Amino acid sequence: MFRLLKRACSFLLFFVIYQSFVIHHNVQRVLAYKPMVEKTLAENDTKANVDLVLAMIYTETKGGEADVMQSSESSSGQKNSITDSQASIEHGVNLLSHNLALAEEAGVDSWTAVQAYNFGTAYIDYIAKHGGQNTVDLATTYSKTVVAPSLGNTSGQTYFYYHPLALISGGKLYKNGGNIYYSREVHFNLYLIELMSLF
């Protein structure tokens, strides 16, 4: 029994060390885009800030793809149509800035604007009509009743999503329904990047 426990602890320790290394590597890759993000933000009149955009890059691609902010779909309606990181950041910042301005105008919290980056701008109006504060419950309902059906999932089909923040809330997403945990992941990744930047 003791030997089994010792093996389990050794495996857990190895897993934690390995994951820490992977996360640190991904954060460093994302931080390489900081000058590009700073330049883009300086050219835009926006309420977005560098840390928020970097956290969104981490959430979207961890800096591992040319379309670092996954801007293609909102730009052209097709995946992977943007093949240049600068263009991806420029379009992503423009969309985020637009969402933040709309959120302020509608009197909703800024995390609604971040969630709308994943769900689409209409989510801002939805939240304005439902209390003005982005929540997982509202995001879940919107995903199920608006986003998923608009992309063909009219049966409420779900799939398991392996992310710690999702697992806390049941771990399921609606097929074609976007990511109901998106804004929370970005928020979490803000702190993750700050922490990993210290090492």
Curated annotation (Swiss-Prot):
InterPro entries: CwlT-like_lysozyme, Lysozyme-like_dom_sf. It comes from the Bacteria. Signal peptide: none annotated. It is found in: Cell surface. GO terms for cellular component: cell surface. This is Pneumococcal vaccine antigen A homolog. It comes from Streptococcus pyogenes serotype M6 (strain ATCC BAA-946 / MGAS10394). The gene is pvaA.
